């Protein structure tokens, strides 16, 4: 069984631009290369891979809900929302404990450890949660979310 957990990765920029990020994208290590890539995306509306014709970044029309499956639940992360342990929170979306019974959800994660991206955006969030009592980086939040699903499904 092949289960694709990462089907769609949108990036919502502060200026209101919605960018589709391919899961195949390897983010550049230096800021200079990253800023050149983002500038190319915003001017040419897409960034293609150097080898092949795969599109790595693509500017898409707003709103975000138009690009997500029907019935998907949007969950925002915020430091001001109710604190919920991820292990208990994840269990409600996959009650049988297997990926086959998984409900479609989308997490809205901010790129900085301060602020409330789950509450400060232009699209409607179904629920906001706080997964730690202190501010976390986006990488740490993504890691905590993935680890919670791995533990719930018994992936070692």
Predicted segments — roles?
Residues 31-34, 93, 102, 123:
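Phenylalanine-focused residue identity feature
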Residues 68-69, 99-102, 121-123:
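Intrinsically disordered, low-complexity regulatory regions enriched in Ser/Pro/Gly/Thr
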Residues 1-87, 95, 150-155:
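RNA substrate-binding interface of SAM-dependent RNA methyltransferases
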Residues 113-156:
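Structured adenosyl-cofactor binding patch, chiefly the S-adenosyl-L-methionine
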């Amino acid at each position: 069984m092949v289960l694709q957990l990462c089907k769609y990765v949108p990036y919502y920029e502060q200026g209101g631009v919605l960018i589709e990020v391919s899961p195949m994208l390897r983010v550049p290590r230096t800021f200079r290369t990253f800023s050149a890539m983002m500038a190319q995306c915003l001017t040419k509306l897409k960034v293609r891979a150097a080898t092949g014709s795969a599109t790595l970044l693509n500017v898409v029309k707003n709103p975000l809900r138009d690009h997500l499956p029907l019935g998907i639940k949007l969950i925002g992360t915020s430091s001001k929302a109710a604190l919920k342990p991820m292990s208990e929170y994840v269990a409600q979306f996959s009650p049988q404990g297997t990926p086959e019974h998984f409900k479609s959800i989308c997490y809205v994660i901010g790129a900085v450890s301060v602020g409330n991206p789950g509450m400060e955006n232009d699209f409607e969030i179904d629920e906001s949660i706080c997964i730690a009592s202190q501010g976390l980086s986006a990488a740490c939040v993504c890691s905590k979310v993935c680890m919670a699903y791995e533990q719930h499904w018994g992936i070692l």
